[in-house]
UniProtKB/Swiss-Prot annotation:
Subunit note: Interacts with MinD and FtsZ.
Role according to the record: Cell division inhibitor that blocks the formation of polar Z ring septums. Rapidly oscillates between the poles of the cell to destabilize FtsZ filaments that have formed before they mature into polar Z rings. Prevents FtsZ polymerization.
Name by which UniProt lists this protein: Probable septum site-determining protein MinC
Family in the record: Belongs to the MinC family.
UniProt cross-references to Pfam families, sorted A to Z: MinC_C (PF03775), MinC_N (PF05209)
InterPro entries, per database record: CAP/MinC_C, MinC, MinC_C_sf, MinC_N, Septum_form_inhib_MinC_C
GO terms classed as biological process: cell morphogenesis; division septum assembly; regulation of cell division; regulation of cell septum assembly
Top-level lineage group: Bacteria
Coiled coil regions, renumbered to chain: none
Organism: Pectobacterium carotovorum subsp. carotovorum (strain PC1)
Gene that produces this protein: minC
The keyword Plastid is annotated on this UniProt entry: no
Length: 228
């Protein structure tokens, strides 16, 4: 029996979302170029989603898209668009409009629940440049080093017991309580639930040192402290 020519499967990918706060193409181009120069291994020729929630219908989307594409970034979709006229322009440009969905309202349950067992994925070998490790629905522990150009991703926490030179993305499914633990933090990028620092944004006293990174849920920004 011959195999069908196509097969549809669900999957998930880690994409950077560029939030536009200015509609001037030259301003956006310059800002993106600076970001790419800061982290070329992470952003050069990268697929990105553009969030246009802060833009209005008067935005010249064609020129804006050209400015973004001229940096080498590949726009795979647009999110945050609520203006019908802008939606039409974006659709005519051949780009899909993505829905991020509504955040679920948290309900405090008075009845104590039995805590579920926490799963952990353990990697005992070095993670080389170009490799990507994803711990789906669990924490990730790497007992060796993570090279520049490598990527470690987890829906939960990430623990690196070696030199961390690559990219670490924790809580990629939206878990804002996830944390990143490194014995030697020299990462190209660290991210928790979509909030990230590039290497030059990591506070200098912690670079190359044992550190613990989490997300301050009051103001939704990353914070860092020594790893005891």
């Amino acid at each position: 029996m011959s195999q069908t020519p196509i097969e549809l499967k669900g999957s998930s990918f880690t994409l950077s979302v560029v939030h536009l706060h200015d509609s001037q193409p030259e301003v956006i181009y310059q800002a993106l170029q600076e970001k790419i120069e800061q982290a070329p291994a992470f952003l050069k020729n990268a697929p990105v989603v553009i969030n246009v929630a802060a833009l209005t219908a008067e935005t010249d989307w064609i020129k804006l898209q050209q400015a973004i594409s001229s940096t080498g970034l590949h726009v795979v979709g647009v999110s945050g668009c609520t203006d019908d006229a802008l939606k039409k322009t974006i659709a005519q440009a051949g780009l899909p409009l993505l829905s991020e969905g509504k955040a679920q309202r948290r309900v405090v349950e008075p009845v104590a629940a039995v805590p579920a067992a926490v799963k952990t994925k353990v990697i005992n070998t070095p993670v080389r440049s170009g490799q990507q490790i994803y711990a789906r629905n669990c924490d990730l522990i790497v007992t060796s080093s993570v090279s520049a150009g490598a990527e470690v991703i987890a829906d939960g926490n990430i623990h690196i017991y070696g030199m961390m030179r690559g990219r670490a993305l924790a809580g990629v499914s939206g878990d804002v309580q996830s944390q990143i633990f490194c014995t030697h933090l020299a990462a190209e990028l660290v991210s928790i639930a979509g909030r990230y620092w590039l290497s030059d944004q990591i506070p200098e006293p912690y670079f190359g040192q044992p550190a613990r990174i989490n997300l301050n849920q009051l103001d939704n920004v990353l914070t860092i402290k020594p790893l005891d």
